[in-house]
Structures are given as structure tokens and as C-alpha cells.
């Protein structure tokens, strides 16, 4: 279920404060029919890995890639469980077999819920995990997100999973590399909100908050030359599967 943008609010905190204080966390529960936001019910400490965290991914060639727009706090097992109950599929690794399959399934209009995603880089390494939700009858269109695990842990010993969520609109020839690639939708905030909304409705989060002005600019282009625009915020969710 896609959560209305008006329902994904949480508590806003300045970027400089996101790693050094205590903030009100939004209590979680299914979004009401008219988009009423949930009410705050507690506090959490900002994660130390947010201090100086990258704002964008990079490509293997060093170009600026997709914008970072979401983060989750929890163990690797919790991350996979939370995304699974929220209806997202783990992406297969890139191999010759999976590369041939995604190409064939795009042409033949066959579903591939675990289709691989291309590598992007944060903290000098490719994504540690990637998830997707297919749309239609082939991998041409899909919601997807990549995550990178922080080396720093919070006071509870949990890493931050920094993520970039986008929607693949179609397959095309890249304007920058000349290779076959997906073109992303420019409305990256909607993908961030969808991911957060899916996790909320699956009762996989304990709370979330916004880091305001995480990005300096409201628009940009990714490594494939695709334009995007954003409200400049980062959504940070705290995983709790005991709810």
C-alpha cells in the first residue's frame, strides 16, 4: 500500500542535529484513510553514522549517482525481515545468468521479482543489499532501493543502512555510457515515502524522523543523466519487528 505523502511526516530535525541529540519519534500504525499522521510517542538518539554521511551514490566511473533519501536502523537480519514483511523482494546478484535473464524477461514480458540491480557506491563500496517491488509483467518497471551498511554503530550496537530509493520507469540506452539501463522517475521523494509507508503498514518500524535539508539542492541528475527533484529530506526509520 502506498502511503499518502501527507501521512509520512514524522518529526523534522536539522541535518546538523541528526547525530547529536534526542528526538521525538513518530509512533507507528497503519495510516488512516484520510491521511492523518501518527502521533509522537517517544524519543531516540540520532545515529552517529549520519555525521558526514554521503548525500549521493557514485557510479563505478566516479560520476554522481542516485540521491540518498532514506535510512533504516537495525541489524542485517532485521533489515531483510522488515523489507520482506513490507512486500519487497531481495535482488539477485549480478551474474551472467541473471543478466541474461533480466534482458530476456524485459523483451518477453516475463516477471522477475528478484531481478538484479546495477552497482552504485557509497563509502567506497557497492551496495550491501538491494530490494525491489515489480510493476507490471516484466522487470522494465519496478520500485527499488539499495542500502549500504555503516561501519559505525549506535548505542544499541545497530548499524545505519543508508539507502537510495528510486522508481525504474523504462529501459533505454544511457545518454552518458551508451549502455542499456533503466531510466528513473524524477519524483524520488515518492519512492522514499512509498518505502517508508510500506514498512509502517507492515508494522516493521518502531518510529521514524526526518533530517531536514539533508541535500543542498532540490534537483540534480544521476549517473545515467536522468533528472530528479527532491524536498531535500532524508527519512530515518528504526526497525522493530516485535510490534
Show where each model-derived region lies.
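N-terminal secretory signal peptides that target proteins for export/translocation
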Residues: 1-13
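Bacterial N-terminal signal peptides
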Residues: 14-29
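Sec/Tat signal peptide C-region and signal peptidase I cleavage site
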Residues: 31-34
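Compositionally biased P/S/T/G-rich terminal and signal peptide-adjacent segments
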Residues: 36-61
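Terminal, regulation- and interaction-focused segments at domain boundaries
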Residues: 53-81
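Envelope-exposed proteins and targeting segments
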Residues: 66-68, 86, 143
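Primarily extracytoplasmic ectodomains and periplasmic/lumenal surface modules that are beta-strand-rich
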Residues: 75-93, 97
Amino acid at each position: 500500500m502506498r502511503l499518502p505523502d501527507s501521512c509520512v511526516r514524522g518529526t523534522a530535525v536539522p541535518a546538523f542535529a541528526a547525530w547529536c541529540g534526542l528526538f521525538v519519534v513518530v509512533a507507528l500504525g497503519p495510516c488512516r484513510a484520510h491521511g492523518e499522521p501518527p502521533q509522537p510517542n517517544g524519543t531516540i538518539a540520532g545515529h552517529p553514522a549520519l555525521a558526514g554521511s554521503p548525500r549521493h551514490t557514485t557510479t563505478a566511473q566516479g560520476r554522481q549517482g542516485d540521491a540518498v533519501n532514506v535510512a533504516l536502523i537495525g541489524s542485517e537480519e532485521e533489515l531483510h525481515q522488515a523489507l520482506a514483511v513490507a512486500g519487497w523482494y531481495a535482488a539477485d546478484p549480478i551474474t551472467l545468468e541473471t543478466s541474461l535473464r533480466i534482458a530476456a524477461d524485459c523483451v518477453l514480458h516475463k516477471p522477475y521479482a528478484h531481478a538484479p540491480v546495477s552497482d552504485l557506491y557509497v563509502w567506497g563500496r557497492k551496495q550491501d543489499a538491494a530490494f525491489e517491488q515489480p510493476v507490471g509483467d516484466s522487470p522494465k518497471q519496478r520500485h527499488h532501493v539499495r542500502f549500504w551498511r555503516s561501519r559505525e554503530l549506535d548505542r544499541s550496537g545497530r548499524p545505519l543502512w543508508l539507502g537510495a530509493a528510486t522508481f525504474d520507469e523504462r529501459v533505454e540506452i544511457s545518454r552518458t555510457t551508451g549502455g542499456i539501463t533503466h531510466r528513473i522517475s524524477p519524483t524520488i521523494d515518492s519512492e522514499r515515502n512509498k518505502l517508508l509507508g510500506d514498512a509502517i503498514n507492515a508494522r516493521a518500524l518502531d518510529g521514524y524522523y526526518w533530517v531536514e535539508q539533508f541535500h543542498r539542492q532540490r534537483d540534480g541528475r544521476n549517473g545515467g543523466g536522468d533528472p530528479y527533484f527532491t524536498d531535500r529530506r532524508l527519512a530515518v526509520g528504526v526497525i522493530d519487528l516485535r510490534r
